[in-house]
């Protein structure tokens, strides 16, 4: 039995009564890309740098882990691509993220006391971001996260991407800007 199970989840482990948000593992897919293979149907296959063992992170397993952590706000599994000017790579990643978003939603089910956020991907391309957002709205997530930013683009590129998308996001659902958190970023961002 792991420590998390012995203490009853993150709230008890941290002695925190406030809501807790957990990520899906999508960023680790990118940051550990040299040790990761992507299989559309299986998920992300991580290879241990220590002993070479493989670990699979599917959308369903990501949701299961976040549920075991007793997270209040869970993230759908996405693929966060590295910054590139190749629109086709960004589109393929976005399409995969949308497939995984639906699988994450199905694995989550419904829970009036928890929330599942879909992650808007699409790189620096407004048309891809808006297409992704449209599909995530159709899936009917409890909130929406903007992912794939602060991964190598300039601050101006990040702000332009935010400005291009924010007015299209549902006004009645919460928003979360992932991975952005320098003091100068936070003072200038209004989503």
Which residue ranges define each predicted feature?
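Glycine-rich phosphate/ribose-binding loops and adjacent secondary-structure elements
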Residues: 107, 111-188
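Conserved small/polar residues in nucleotide/adenosyl-binding loops
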Residues: 1-5, 190-191
